[in-house]
């Protein structure tokens, strides 16, 4: 009998610790009054996907949240899948050229491509895992209903 009580007590302790953790996560995802500061948190991995699932209710935007982009779709997808931003790709191309005083005019002009001046496209990982984000920022990745 005492073994059963001990097991029941252990199960109860695990359930309570799990419930308090889930409750603290739900606090971050609860709707807030307008004007009140929203808590921010870092969401990475499974926590990010679960937060998006809860906030967006299964309705998501495409890979990039902005409808119009400075970078062409094929170029941005190549950079996305290679793990390289447009800035990093431009820096790698510039590193392959000889040093400044020796550059020929055509090579020097090639350094001034649009990729140097493009703004880096940021995704949900950049905004919510690399740095903290709020629920309203997470909602910007939800699709229209």
Swiss-Prot record:
Subcellular location: Secreted
Signal found in the keyword field: yes
TM stretches of this protein: none
Record propeptide residues: 20-33, 117-122
A Pfam family matched in the record: Insulin
InterPro entries attached to this UniProt entry: Insulin-like (IPR016179), Insulin-like_sf (IPR036438), Insulin_CS (IPR022353), Insulin_family (IPR022352)
Subunit text: Heterodimer of a B chain and an A chain linked by two disulfide bonds.
PROSITE patterns in the cross-refs: INSULIN (PS00262)
UniProt xrefs under CDD domains: IlGF_insulin_bombyxin_like
Cysteine pairings via disulfide bonds: 44-129, 56-142, 128-133
Descriptive protein name: LIRP
Highest taxon of the lineage: Eukaryota
PANTHER family found in the cross-reference section: INSULIN-LIKE PEPTIDE 1-RELATED, INSULIN-LIKE PEPTIDE 2-RELATED
Family to which the UniProt record says this protein belongs: Belongs to the insulin family.
Keywords, in A-Z order: Cleavage on pair of basic residues, Disulfide bond, Hormone, Secreted, Signal
Organism for this UniProt entry: Locusta migratoria
Signal peptide location: 1-19
MF terms (GO), sorted A to Z: hormone activity
Gene Ontology CC, one term: extracellular region
Keyword Signal: yes
